[in-house]
Amino acid sequence: MAAEDFALPADHNPLDTDLLNVFCWVAKTQSFSRAAAELGTSQPVITRKIGRLEECLGVALFVRSNRGCVLTAAGTVLIGKAPSILLQLAEIKEEVSHSASVVSGSLSMGITHAASTVMAPRLLPVIARRWPKLQVDVMEALSRTLVERVLHGELALAVLFDPPPHPDLICRPLLIERLCLVGNPQSDLRTMAPPTIRDLARLPLMLPSGGQIIRNLLEDAFAEINEPLKPVYEAASMAMLREMAVQGIGYTLLTQGGVAEDVAAGKLIAQALPDKGMVVTLTLITKRESTRLRNVRLLSDFVASEIRAVARQGQWPGHPTVVGG
């Protein structure tokens, strides 16, 4: 195809992708200052770039106030198109730069603490040896946070527990893990028979705050036996719940992988819950449109394969059931 068949007119002034990226961050955070913090720059720089974009388009994109900013009608139209434009440009860059089959660039991956404890020390050195020009940044967070970051394009992939169904996500189940009741080694848990849901109803439970998968499972289980779920403490941080269990304040629920280090160190003991349904599924997720990127496909396949291999070799705490692969 000849260049004149698709080239823009010589006097056309195309949009700057940097300005579009800044616009997306301001739209997401609804704040010039928070967008500046996310992008590692100053608020005046963000303000100038949004001003340049508005001047280029000839419309106002935000309505500012003391509380932040909201999109105008024109801004709403742009936010509906800008992320996909930026992704397409990223795909073009990857396809061109990788035309010689060199795996390079950078990707961000998320992982829950339970999986990170087992896999991060294994994955990162192998990735570095296999693809020395590929930089992989790993962040650890709660499953709910990881889902949001994948959907927003901040993470290329994530390994987490039981993501909710979403049309923009591709979910790849990896392992089914049984939940455990976790407590201090000097607690009654040491001599307790495998604890049932009815047993849990009589214990001082410290649980994740509402909306997290373990909390949701327990709420459903307690409803089935007509018992109210009344934890003595709630926290969004699994690390905080673990530490409170170490101190003997109460009991919490985690996977074997999530407490393997503390159990090995003698800080905690764990008993698997035998009740049906007291399981979670470790799942790898990617955004549907991101799977067109070769690096995302390569890393996703590798991570999924390694996690399943570790479990099949009996090296994953609790001996979870391997799914797929």
Swiss-Prot record:
Residues 15-72 form the HTH lysR-type domain. Pfam families: HTH_1 (PF00126), LysR_substrate (PF03466). PROSITE patterns: HTH_LYSR. This is HTH-type transcriptional regulator BbuR. GO terms for molecular function: DNA-binding transcription factor activity; transcription cis-regulatory region binding. Belongs to the LysR transcriptional regulatory family. InterPro entries: LysR_subst-bd, Tscrpt_reg_HTH_LysR, WH-like_DNA-bd_sf, WH_DNA-bd_sf. Residues 32-51 bind DNA. Keywords: DNA-binding, Transcription, Transcription regulation. The lineage of its organism: Bacteria, Pseudomonadati, Pseudomonadota, Betaproteobacteria, Burkholderiales.
